[in-house]
């Protein structure tokens, strides 16, 4: 029986499809069980908050009310210029009560992450190149005063605010760890090692978190902030902070606002980046002078 051109094409097509299916099966099997964290740039494609909600400006009242948004003030944030030793002394009594709770704090590896969902953060520490240990020690001993603070606030759209357990789970997935001044910090390493890149405080006074009562804790807003001078690679640290804030707002139904209490837009984020570039330029000019 003579095989025509049509039959040959059908046979070749079947072989190609089988090869593709086999290759896909091999790749899926090879990558099974591996948890990868990557900075998800796809969140930049999320619709701006202006398109989903009308612009809301925080009102002037500072008295907490379940029907009003909290009054956010940059001065309410913990001082970025406070030394670690001062933070330890001022919170030593409270820290003693929370040590036991911190032992039970879920670790990154203990979280039930959705492997099929978008991965936002990288577990690789080489995103922030490490300096020599001697240089790191010198920097810790002589920390320069903070000249500028970049603030991104996330405000809950729900009157009940962000619930403690859900908030804790979300920020732990973003690599933040409970630490100095009873607030959360994002270090170079997802494990909580290395220099602090940025921090997150409770935007409602007194501005701290109590892990001993986290199950009953709730807040209407939190504030992410990055001080300049601060991390050795501020632009990369800022990108990680933006991703953490967007992740929280996206998953817990929050709204991003800038340091002027206006809705955060792509233009606002770009303006923040320009502030970092300008600060680095001024710092370089001062060093040369």
Curated annotation (Swiss-Prot):
Entry keyword set: Cell cycle, Cell division, Cell inner membrane, Cell membrane, Membrane, Transmembrane, Transmembrane helix
Record topology, Cytoplasmic segments: 23-289
A Pfam family per the record: ZipA_C
Compositional bias of kind Basic and acidic residues: 64-77, 85-106, 123-141
One GO CC term, this protein: plasma membrane
SUPFAM superfamilies documented for this protein: Cell-division protein ZipA, C-terminal domain
Topology, Periplasmic side: 1
Coiled-coil annotated spans: none
Primary site of residence: membrane
Location of the protein in the cell: Cell inner membrane
Membrane topology, record value: Single-pass type I membrane protein
SMART domains given in the database record: ZipA_C
Residues spanning the membrane: 2-22
Location of region: Disordered: 48-141
Protein name, per record: Cell division protein ZipA
Native source species: Pseudomonas savastanoi pv. phaseolicola (strain 1448A / Race 6)
